[in-house]
């Protein structure tokens, strides 16, 4: 099977990163309220599992929500929710990946979750909760196929979209070479 730092389940820390993505401005009230409600559900679920959620926010609505409730936020990104720059996206991904790969004494997390809105149509936007890291290795046709595991919303989504397939990623030349590149 594939062995890579981003595919390894961590047991050396109970800290778990939760990135909450909302809008910066108030016109999208229901949009942000739904995301904040889903993030609270995820946080509650993680705490029930004995994990320590570490909150990251993208968007002023999320930042304000947690700040108003005196809930600590590890890092916030604001001002670009309508058109995120490549630099901000790189900063978010680098921050979360380095925290996942860090040592426990340096504030590592064992998982990275994201709560965001998936756009379906102009009228329909669906809140999504996904575990992004660690990637879960699934041997379907042999070694080297990866699938993202959507921990918190998996059962709900399967009932809602019974015929939807989980996204599979096939790496060529090999998954190990791609991940080590």
Task: Describe each model-derived feature in a short phrase.
Residues 1-181:
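C-terminal beta-strand-loop-alpha-helix "lid" module of Rossmann-like NAD(P)-dependent dehydrogenases
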């Amino acid at each position: 099977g594939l062995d890579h730092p981003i595919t390894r389940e961590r047991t050396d820390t109970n800290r778990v990163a939760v990135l909450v993505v909302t809008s910066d401005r108030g016109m999208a009230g229901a949009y942000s309220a739904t995301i904040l409600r889903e993030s609270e559900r995820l946080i509650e679920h993680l705490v029930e599992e004995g994990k320590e959620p570490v909150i990251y926010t993208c968007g002023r609505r999320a930042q304000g929500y947690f700040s108003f409730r005196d809930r600590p936020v590890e890092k916030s990104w604001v001002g670009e929710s309508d058109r995120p720059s490549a630099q901000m996206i790189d900063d978010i991904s680098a921050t979360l990946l380095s925290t996942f790969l860090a040592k426990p004494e340096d504030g590592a997390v064992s998982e990275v979750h994201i709560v965001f809105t998936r756009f379906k149509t102009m009228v329909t936007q669906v809140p999504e909760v996904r575990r992004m890291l660690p990637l879960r290795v699934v041997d379907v046709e042999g070694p080297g196929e990866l699938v993202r595991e959507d921990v918190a919303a998996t059962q709900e989504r399967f009932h809602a979209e019974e015929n939807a397939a989980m996204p599979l990623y096939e790496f060529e030349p090999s998954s190990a070479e791609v991940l080590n590149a």
